[in-house]
Regions:
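Acceptor/aglycone-binding surface of glycosyltransferases and processive sugar-polymer synthases
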Residues: 71-88, 105-183, 209-235
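Short beta-strand-to-loop acidic/aromatic patch adjacent to the donor-nucleotide binding site
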Residues: 91-100
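Conserved sequence signature across two-component system core domains
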Residues: 23, 47-49, 69
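A conserved acidic beta->alpha catalytic loop
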Residues: 48-56, 101
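N-proximal low-complexity "stem/linker" segments adjacent to membrane-targeting elements
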Residues: 1-36
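Residues at the starts of beta-strands that form the adenosine-phosphate
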Residues: 16, 43, 199
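Catalytic donor-sugar/metal-binding loop of nucleotide-sugar-dependent glycosyltransferases
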Residues: 157, 178-181, 190-208
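Acidic helix N-cap motif at the loop->helix transition within catalytic regions
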Residues: 28-32, 53-62
Length: 237
């Protein structure tokens, strides 16, 4: 799983809903993101995926549990580590949440409520039935292509197959095994939803694109990499 730097006591209230954040060189934003979640009473685990900056230290100071990968394994592997950590610590619900400030912490409750309201295993955030503030046109095209590819290969039709904002029941989390270490893990999760016949609902969420998040993850090379990883992931299984 990696080296654990901290295990602070869970805050009062909502202690069975764990927030999992995969982070790589996010020292600039991770403290603010962790605090935005902690103030709402959720325990948080940050998986520092081999960062070269102060990500782990900043997250620890902000009050997160921190698990460190000695080397960078990719977002999929970091999420797998975080989900297992949360389940091990008696999470009844696991929420995956981005480290770069794109997600809104005040929408976590909407996501977790959707699990019970719709009696589903997964609540998946969608920026296309919600809002995508400042999204680049290239990113829209890439995400639409990824959603189409995912629908064709899994039979699960979603508007936003690559949204990192998810709420997952404990039972579903224990069955989830992420093998794709890079961005294709998102479609792999949908593939497992189909394989295990798990129930899913999409929930409108707001994704805010900032100069920081655009520099971090919205390059053309990353968009192309998503599609390459999807293709390679399918032919290798």
């Amino acid at each position: 799983m990696g080296m654990t730097l901290s295990a602070p006591a869970a805050p009062p209230g909502r202690a069975d809903i764990w927030i999992v954040i995969a982070a790589f060189n996010e020292g600039t934003m991770i403290g603010e993101v962790v605090r935005s979640v902690k103030v709402r009473g959720y325990p948080v685990v940050v998986v520092d995926d081999g960062s070269h900056d102060s990500t782990a230290e900043v997250a620890l100071h902000a009050g997160a549990h921190v698990v460190v990968h000695p080397i960078n394994l990719g977002q999929g592997a970091a999420l797998q580590t975080g989900i297992k950590y949360a389940v091990h610590n008696d999470a009844h619900v696991v929420v995956t949440f981005d480290a770069d400030g794109q997600h809104a912490a005040d929408e976590i409750e909407r996501m977790t409520d959707a699990l019970a309201t719709h009696n589903v295993d997964f609540a998946l955030g969608s920026r296309f039935i919600g809002q995508a503030v400042g999204i680049p046109k290239l990113r829209v095209l890439t995400l639409k292509a990824a959603a189409l590819f995912t629908w064709i290969t899994t039979g699960v039709r979603l508007t936003d197959a690559h949204n990192g904002f998810r709420a997952i029941t404990r039972d579903a989390a224990t069955r989830l095994e992420i093998y794709q270490n890079r961005m294709a893990h998102a479609s792999e999760i949908v593939s497992q939803i189909a394989k295990h016949k798990m129930r899913v609902v999409e929930v409108p969420v707001t994704i805010t694109y900032t100069d920081y998040s655009l520099r971090k993850g919205q390059k053309l090379s990353n968009s192309v990499r998503i599609l390459i990883d999807l293709f390679l992931g399918r032919i290798s299984r």
